[in-house]
Swiss-Prot record:
Underlying gene: gltX2
Task of the protein: Catalyzes the attachment of glutamate to tRNA(Glu) in a two-step reaction: glutamate is first activated by ATP to form Glu-AMP and then transferred to the acceptor end of tRNA(Glu).
EC number(s) recorded for this UniProt protein: 6.1.1.17
Chief subcellular location: cytoplasm
This protein's UniProt keywords: Aminoacyl-tRNA synthetase, ATP-binding, Cytoplasm, Ligase, Nucleotide-binding, Protein biosynthesis
GO cellular component: cytosol
Catalyzed reactions: tRNA(Glu) + L-glutamate + ATP = L-glutamyl-tRNA(Glu) + AMP + diphosphate
Record-level Gene Ontology MF annotations: ATP binding; glutamate-tRNA ligase activity; tRNA binding; zinc ion binding
Example of a GO biological process term: glutamyl-tRNA aminoacylation
Protein name per UniProt: Glutamate--tRNA ligase 2
PROSITE patterns per record: AA_TRNA_LIGASE_I
Amino acid sequence: MTNIVTRFAPSPTGFLHIGGARTALFNYLFARHHKGKFLLRIEDTDAARSTEEYKLGIIDSLKWLKINWDNDIFYQSANLQRHVNVALELVKSGKAYYCFTSQEEIDLQRQLAIAQKQSFIFRSPWRNNIPSSLSLKNNNKAYVIRFKAPNHGTTIINDYVQGKVVFQNQQIDDMILVRSDGTPTYMLAVVVDDHDMGITHIIRGDDHLTNAAKQIALYDALGWKAPAMVHIPLIYGPDGTKLSKRHGAIGVDAYQKMGYLPEALCNYLLRLGWSYQDEEIISHERAIKLFDIDGLGKSAARLDFDKMLYLNGYYIRSTDNSILAKLVIEILSKQYILSNESCNLIQKGMSGLKSRANLLTDLAENAKIYVLENQLTFVNEALNIIQKTPSMLITEVIDIINNLQELNCESVKQSLTEFAKVKHMKLGQLMDPIRALLTGNTKSPSIFEVIPILGKIHAVKRLADIEAIKSNNQ
């Protein structure tokens, strides 16, 4: 295969949504798999809707997903004159023309077509009226430049996913290339930029399939080779309808804030429309090794939030404790001024914490048991257990902990197990109030692990608060 060059070309009129992220991922993986180039082009020609915030948001989301591009970012707005010059070349060669039809006249034609129950394809009276159009142009009458699209025969797209797609040229209108204000349209700019950037393959949503027919006609008129087309099905919501905000979070930044890991989100998006045998868990490196467009499916993919959450939990449990601790500390630092001791406790307790969390935000919430700056809050079930527990029982537990020569999981487990037998209690009956006092909850990592991590001083202090907790919650 020739040197592959792909691109992702978002418009900064909103944040990066997961459909766009999947498109970027597929283009990135295809280029990396074939040792080609993946380029990023910001299509910022819509000045009214494009913002710096959205542009930076898209770039940050791609970086977070580790979808790294080659070369500098290409900004479409920096190439406007080139776009216009190409349109003028088409006019000169008779493949585009100046059109002076007003929008009001076009709207009237559309209304007549609707009234006659006909599909509307605008046919400009200026298409072949070159002398008159030049005269009006010289008299400064407002105009647009339209492409003289082929009006007979067919345009064929040999798409890698959709197969052979045939468009009747009589159904393709003469699209505007340059607006009346002198700015190029998307349809012109995308063709010129893809050509100039040397793009060999375009992977994008199948909602662009109709655009592809117009763009290929434009490539033909310019005598340029069109990139290979790969139109993938869109992502749908769990109910089978087009993905929208009513289905929940659709922006990559929202998933980041919710506590998803980039590796998990990429793994999930990879499997939305692409497959390799029955593999579900596919790392970034393995995805680069395996990905090719022959694995892309033709059927629409549906979001499955449960599967996404499961994958995230898997990646949390598979991630190194030190990396998770750093991420959790970053989250908790927005709420607390964490001491070095608290950070160390979070690091030590990560093994037990991560086995119970599917989201980083949940992991951070659970890690609060090791934040010494945090005033424990107690769930109602924990308070009920504490109220029913004799304070003398906890006093004896405190004595056991204080008298341990070595404080570790084994010593705590052995001593508390023996104490429960002496008291003729089931071990769980003893653990429940200890857990409630140490964590404020009825669920936590193993108490045999929590006590050594907290250490004697902090564990004993929390246990000794039993009377105060009882009196404050009567």
